[in-house]
Amino acid sequence: MTLENKKILVAGLGGTGISMIAYLRKNGAEVAAYDAELKPERVSQIGKMFDGLVFYTGRLKDALDNGFDILALSPGISERQPDIEAFKQNGGRVLGDIELLADIVNRRGDKVIAITGSNGKTTVTSLVGYLCIKCGLDTVIAGNIGTPVLEAEWQREGKKADVWVLELSSFQLENTESLRPTAATVLNISEDHLDRYDDLLDYAHTKAKIFRGDGVQVLNADDAFCRAMKRAGREVKWFSLEHEADFWLERETGRLKQGNEDLIATKDIPLQGLHNAANVMAAVALCEAVGLPREALLEHVKTFQGLPHRVEKIGKKNGVVFIDDSKGTNVGATAAAIAGLQNPLFVILGGMGKGQDFTPLRDALAGKAKGVFLIGVDAPQIRRDLDGCGLNMTDCATLEEAVQTAYAQAEACDIVLLSPACASFDMFKGYAHRSEVFIEAFKAL
């Protein structure tokens, strides 16, 4: 991709946008910056980093009318808006940081493991990265997991990696056309971001863009959307919690298997829950696809301790166990967390629902939940969607109130689970802040 002397507008000035500005300027592009709401202190801060950088704010159309060749979008900005559609129709190109990285790794020959899905993608990305490092590969872990890919590339000063392990969101995949992963997975599809996509099929089609090229596909045999993503002529590795597959769970023995070969007992996996058994199978399949030995992978799986805020036990009070799954920001994630826990539950739900339908939680909660505590702006919708299913639902003004009320109703061996099925920004700075408040409320009991 030729960037020299191209006139490029970078839209969105978070970490990804800043990394794109740095990369594009280094490669000779004429770069300007845009943000819909641009505070003077932010202009000053970024201006100190990039001498002579021109800033635009207000309407995106007005900025684009200045003769730009390329619009480089941060993932939080949808390209499905009239101003951007008109820009493309007039010959402009729209891309993001993943497309820029794809150009780099394609030229250099770096291997890429790419991971997406509605739920589990951060856990699988972390596990795959951990396994690659433990097996001796020079590994870069980047993308939606936290470090922007071009920032990671900048830190490496152009040095080729043995493997890039990329967590990719649907937002990042929207304008990615050239990425050709060595191995890739869509872990699952459930309702998420339906405030951005036309419907669930539209969302699934965007996720499936991760399978461009001819690399190994790792697919969830239990998910109808994932089954439909199989590409003709491609090597596919299937994983399943329900029936025999390339990688599968033998329920009677509680062991993961590869075909007929025994792999590992679920009790030897530090990660809790059946959904994490699926995550381990996907991770091992991805790592094998880049040539890592199975025996070493399984040994290292036993030492991976997982991530904070993902079905994480934070403590026990008078026999009542408190579990933090603040990262459960959609219905599918919360349903998986509930399915993976055995004891009776009191579940804290609510926040910003992102246009989801919460009725699938009726089946997930049935027979397991003793009570539900609702918080946040979309608590009324959750109550409507769950109404009539026989659950005792309590509205709480704060997360602290929900923790106190749940604890007052719980008995020894019960679980109080924070798994909101919603984003957090109506009440908190993010899911990590929500987790901190939950933990402090537990400590205050």
UniProtKB/Swiss-Prot annotation:
Record: residues binding ATP: 117-123
Subcellular location: Cytoplasm
Location, primary (coarse class): cytoplasm
Pfam (any one): Mur_ligase_M
Pathway membership, UniProt: Cell wall biogenesis; peptidoglycan biosynthesis
Catalytic activity, reaction form: UDP-N-acetyl-alpha-D-muramoyl-L-alanine + D-glutamate + ATP = UDP-N-acetyl-alpha-D-muramoyl-L-alanyl-D-glutamate + ADP + phosphate + H(+)
GO molecular function: ATP binding; UDP-N-acetylmuramoylalanine-D-glutamate ligase activity
GO biological process: cell division; cell wall organization; peptidoglycan biosynthetic process; regulation of cell shape
An example Gene Ontology CC term for this record: cytoplasm
Keyword vocabulary terms for this entry: ATP-binding, Cell cycle, Cell division, Cell shape, Cell wall biogenesis/degradation, Cytoplasm, Ligase, Nucleotide-binding, Peptidoglycan synthesis
Biological role: Cell wall formation. Catalyzes the addition of glutamate to the nucleotide precursor UDP-N-acetylmuramoyl-L-alanine (UMA).
HAMAP family tied to this protein: MurD
Protein name as catalogued: UDP-N-acetylmuramoylalanine--D-glutamate ligase
Organism: Neisseria meningitidis serogroup C / serotype 2a (strain ATCC 700532 / DSM 15464 / FAM18)
Taxonomic lineage of the native organism: Bacteria, Pseudomonadati, Pseudomonadota, Betaproteobacteria, Neisseriales
